Amino acid sequence: ADAPNFLILSNGFEITAGGTTVGNNANGNLYTYYAFASDQSAAPVLADSFANKLYNGTGNELTVSGLGFQPSMSWLKTLNAANEWNLYDNVRGPFNKIKSNTTSAQETTGALSGFYIDGFTLRGSGYSLNQPGQNNISYNWKANPIPTINTDGTIQSLVSANQASGFSIVQYTGTGSNATVGHGLSAAPELVIVKKTSGVQNWMVGATVVGWTKYLELNLTNPAATASTTWNDTDPTTTTVSLG
């Protein structure tokens, strides 16, 4: 039977793991990264892959619908109150939020309780992003409703991918050594965003336009910095992202 740390996948199962060391590839740590690329052989259909949606909080259980697809990742922010940016995805599971403006580890007390065929549901009273009088925005991406075990890299990963739109959600456990991680897309990602979910760490960003010898930090205002220990000075390939 399923348990909170046991995930049924389209091609197997995954037992989640975690650790305490900082970094984007530290030994024993659990991470999620988001990879973006396009499939030149399959034209993306924007209406079927991404949608933003405004909604008003109610304080009661709320269904946000009208996306036109089942989202795999939702990024939520209150517009008229000082709440943090909350990010949810179907690889880490409902309730598990990471906050893109902070260094915080994943929290299991999030408002989003599930994804469904046309949107998502939110818990009621006591949760930000669904309070009476609050106006909120959601940005929603479609990947795969059922994550898949990926063995393309030297580190096994858990992937939810939409090759047509060039978007994937990837979870992996760091080793502390140079490694590669499969992203599930059919083209090399041009943008990769990584967050350590098992502990405190800045959000690491890699981009082709910046160069893969450098990195940015999503939650900070710092300029691009150079470090071979981030992407191992290696461009992503059509199957993997490199880690230093």
Q: Residue spans of the language-model regions?
A:
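Surface-exposed molecular-recognition determinants
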Residues: 1-244
